[in-house]
């Protein structure tokens, strides 16, 4: 599947020493976007994984998670940056590859025991994914799996998530480049 070749690499963004993997070139291409959603849909249908809802991490996790929610017939729950959700929220701070941030989820976003597929575009340090998983768990959900378009194995996020007991699935890896 030619997904990797559709992802643009931008050196020294957002700061020097970071190689940014830009999926906008992938998702603006209707064939590339369809490949991503079709592949993920097929993977989860064939795996028979038991989950109730998809949680997408702002912002690119909304794009993939929303489309995947539609194709799989699942609800969608957003994890957002602070101040973007209108009702009561819980927050989680986290470290990322180039700084720190905070994310939030509505306190009533999930029903106790709901199984969640957590979706984002890219896995680097695992900080964002761990923070989102903590939010899911704070509001009563269970993370069934985490799905990403891009994994950067050299940065160590996948290893960190696996060590914490999370299942991880990604479409493509950028190793050593």
Swiss-Prot record:
Its EC number is 2.4.2.7. It is an enzyme of class 2 (transferase). It is found in: Cytoplasm. Pfam families: Pribosyltran. Pathway: Purine metabolism; AMP biosynthesis via salvage pathway; AMP from adenine: step 1/1. GO terms for molecular function: adenine binding; adenine phosphoribosyltransferase activity; AMP binding. GO terms for biological process: adenine salvage; AMP salvage; purine ribonucleoside salvage. Keywords: Cytoplasm, Glycosyltransferase, Purine salvage, Transferase. One of its GO terms (cellular component) is cytoplasm. Gene3D superfamilies: 3.40.50.2020. NCBIfam families: apt, PRK02304.1-3, PRK02304.1-5. Belongs to the purine/pyrimidine phosphoribosyltransferase family. Homodimer. This is Adenine phosphoribosyltransferase. It comes from Chlorobium chlorochromatii (strain CaD3). The gene is apt.
